[in-house]
């Protein structure tokens, strides 16, 4: 029988293990309390704001509280500590940027609800071909395209069942080994088998492609919208407006097309035996190519099983195309956009997206009632569904992300109003004199590193406001630092926790972390290199003003007395 002292230690140990969040939620604010006390003693709002940011950062990193709940802290503490009025803080939780994000998610759900994504994927894969390498290229291409227009997590979630269906067909027809053997990776009884090297490439490929596609447009990922919101809030007099069009022109040529091409080539070499015909993987692929006709027949049959394109799918495809046109032509930059021609009031991207959202909730999936109206068919007693169901949206929208974005914008406003940004800028002046490429590399690698262990949007909310102030202190155009860092935050390929697509595929396909981390080494190096080249070459063409420190930035710097 255990001694009473030993039993107490055992109970205490179990309590610490299973109830650590409750203790940490008290300990973390106590650890940061000296910052707040100093703020009250010196009556410096900067340190009160610093306490709030540090406390929220620690709670976000440790996930002591749900990250979405932590994002609500500014609603309580900004007014309570006298940092910002409650009315101003509340407005940050439903800005134009957040409405754009919400609209993009709803349109993505409309595509999923109509099953349009499956038809697009199968069509593209059939065009590309049925060999394993061609299948991989097709899956990567579809994932990249979807990542451009819908959130990368939604795109990955849509692609996973498609990949699983293909993998099951490959396994059934014995085209190549899709799972590891017991000798290669032992599995406990009842556990699912681990995917083979080639199968890992399929799943990791769609995750990386979705993340890369998300770099291409403002609605592709939450970090892009965080960047736009923070940049607009901090630099309201900037002559460079971050529009859907110029962000797209900046990112797609190099950050998306070149980046994904290099990543595809890297995967084909490392995981599919390209240029290595005598390797084990190369021999497996060569043997699988002999069954290419069988795989093409399977794909064709799956495509035929979908049947002809329904009225539901056609309408959703038209709405999707119309959304793209509205977003690009709102303010393209080189010619007046439709928002300039309508009236003198500012019409943001949220207006165009909201119109599409209203449209897909209003239009029916089919128009059989016209037959009755024309006397050519019986009366349909049943109600006809809309293109998108509100109940489906309620179940599938990640509402917490809206709070996360709003919390970041509220912190940015608090930093500006209290002067914390000035204090941070002065601390960054040690970097004055370093070449731009060196400063960019430092900020990019740090942003990438922190994103490896935390949610992308959380890191963006913490890092981007600091880089805005750093750019003023170093007298660099803010886009030179903030834009590549924004992209770097999304290009984290090492760990499952780094991005939502990574987490989705590792859980869905039961991929071990060590295999997933190995996949991410080369794509990360490619991403960092392409981002730095893009910023200092193509980026200077799209944003020519970023070559020098602009007058409006000088005025902001003088006003803040950096």
Swiss-Prot record:
Q: InterPro entries attached here?
A: Na/sul_symport_CS, SLC13A/DASS
How is this protein situated with respect to the membrane? Answer: Multi-pass membrane protein
Report whether Protease shows up as a keyword of the record: no
Subcellular location field: Membrane
| Membrane-crossing segments per the record | 24-44, 64-84, 93-113, 135-155, 200-220, 249-269, 308-328, 350-370, 393-413, 430-450, 478-498, 515-535
A GO molecular-function annotation: citrate transmembrane transporter activity
Q: What keywords are assigned to this protein? A: Membrane, Transmembrane, Transmembrane helix, Transport
PROSITE patterns assigned: NA_SULFATE
> Under the cellular component aspect of Gene Ontology, which terms does the record hold?
plasma membrane
Entry's Gene Ontology BP terms: citrate transport; determination of adult lifespan; pyruvate transport; succinate transport; transmembrane transport
Q: Which family does it belong to?
A: Belongs to the SLC13A/DASS transporter (TC 2.A.47) family. NADC subfamily.
What is this protein's function per UniProt? Cation-independent electroneutral transporter (not associated with membrane depolarization) of a variety of tricarboxylic and dicarboxylic acid-cycle intermediates. There is also small, but detectable, transport of monocarboxylics. Transport is through the epithelium of the gut and across the plasma membranes of organs involved in intermediary metabolism and storage.
* Protein's UniProt name: Protein I'm not dead yet 2
